[in-house]
Amino acid sequence: MRAHLGTPRVPAQLHALIADDCLGEHAYGYLGAHQPMPPQPSWEAGFRVMWNLLLDDVVASGCYTPPESDRLRELYQRHQHHFEHPVEPRLLHMDLWAQKLLVDEVGNVTRLLDLDRALWGDPEIEFAVLDYCGISEPAFWRGYGQARDTSPSAEIRRRFYLLYEVQKYMPIRVWRRGDPGRAGVSGA
């Protein structure tokens, strides 16, 4: 996929928005009107809640057994300290790829679609989504205007973020197939 030259500016502009200024509170996590989780006071707490809620969904969909989920929870606990770094709660789209951008006839990005997965947190998790979509290339980083953190702690976070992204699709696939027995949902 060939990204438009303006594409890196879109997440850079989103990431410039801080929850404190936009919401009037210092909060992390999915904080939309649908209230999927309570606001959290730190990124580590926010991601921990997100991680555990996702694992609950993966188990409910029948994709993991409870012992498999427990091993992933324990893995996070062992690496939790890597998420305890100071980071402002930035606005993250979490589903940014070419089809989510509207451009005018000369190629300027004019609209951003689908903010239903947006959250407040560490931009590094958004970069994992961009990696997954094949957007995070050297040209992206030049356009974004900030170098990527390549520290050992950032690499560990990146692996968790990528695993988080991939695991999201496990229950989605089961539940969209309409298999209520396997999904643990009655009447779906």
What do the predicted segments below correspond to?
Residues 47, 89-92, 97-156, 168:
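Active-site Asp-x-Gly
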Residues 73-76, 138-141, 186:
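Hydrophobic core segments within long, regular secondary-structure runs in both alpha-
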Residues 142, 146, 169-188:
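ATP/Mg2+ or Mg2+-diphosphate-binding catalytic cores
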Residues 36-37, 117, 149, 175:
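Alpha-solenoid HEAT/Armadillo repeat architecture
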Residues 1-2, 52-60, 164-180:
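A glycine-centered beta->alpha junction motif in the catalytic cores
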Residues 156, 160-164:
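Start-of-helix signal in alpha-solenoid helical-repeat scaffolds, especially tetratricopeptide repeats
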Residues 1-77, 81-89, 120:
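A cross-family kinase active-site recognition segment
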Residues 62-67, 147-152, 178-181:
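Structural helix-adjacent loops and short alpha-helical linkers that scaffold large soluble proteins
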